[in-house]
């Protein structure tokens, strides 16, 4: 069986975690618009994730879609549909990570803090270790912050079984959304494949998340 591009990138990650990064920085010259590996990656915006480095991707090989948490929301789906149908990607890689900031709050808590609730401001400040400055007013946008479901924990708390399962549950939730979207085919000649991972920020290693399994939601 021919190795998938995702499997090849996992081998790059093994080398990266061992101190042998395969990403080559620098402008490579003219490139085609379609990603040469036919891969799209959805990942968290966390500064500790250098997606190109940890997957050994070169310029022009993949689409990189990033947001807070690496969550599969409407905009991520919009990007994936365009990536697949117009730019010929067929493998989707979803990357969450340990010590994620999306574990440190709930949607209701952050919204209350932004609107000026003193108790919420204090709790967020305790979680983040910095003074939280409220906007002091309400806003309908964004409609949700999409924090991972569960009790808030201190920002950048050490990895635990509970936090790992919360992250894995959101990976599975994202996989389910992608696999069940009517415009992202999983069968036939134009089928996509989707796999989800947790990146350990302490070791540099990607760990695959089993699917199906327990799924999370937004806090």
From Swiss-Prot:
Family: Belongs to the beta-class carbonic anhydrase family.
Cofactor note: Binds 1 zinc ion per subunit.
EC numbers, comma separated: 3.13.1.7
Activity control note: Weakly inhibited by thiocyanate (SCN(-)).
GO molecular function terms listed in the Swiss-Prot or TrEMBL record: carbonate dehydratase activity; hydrolase activity; zinc ion binding
Stated name of the protein: Carbonyl sulfide hydrolase
Subunit (UniProt): Homotetramer. Two pairs of subunits form tightly associated dimers.
InterPro entries: Carbonic_anhydrase, Carbonic_anhydrase_sf
Cofactor: Zn(2+)
Catalysed reactions listed for this entry: carbonyl sulfide + H2O = hydrogen sulfide + CO2 + H(+)
Binding of Zn(2+), residues: 44, 97, 100
Originating organism: Thiobacillus thioparus
Keywords in alphabetical order: Hydrolase, Metal-binding, Zinc
Gene3D superfamilies per record: Carbonic anhydrase (3.40.1050.10)
SMART domains: Pro_CA
Enzyme type, top EC level: hydrolase
Pfam families associated with the record: Pro_CA (PF00484)
Keyword Transcription carried by entry: no
Function as written in the Swiss-Prot or TrEMBL entry: Catalyzes the degradation of carbonyl sulfide (COS) to hydrogen sulfide and CO(2). May function as one of the microbial sinks for ambient COS, which is an atmospheric trace gas leading to sulfate aerosol formation, thereby participating in the global radiation balance and ozone chemistry. Shows little CO(2) hydration activity and poor carbon disulfide (CS(2)) hydrolysis activity.
Listed PANTHER family: CARBON DISULFIDE HYDROLASE (PTHR43175:SF3), CARBONIC ANHYDRASE (PTHR43175)
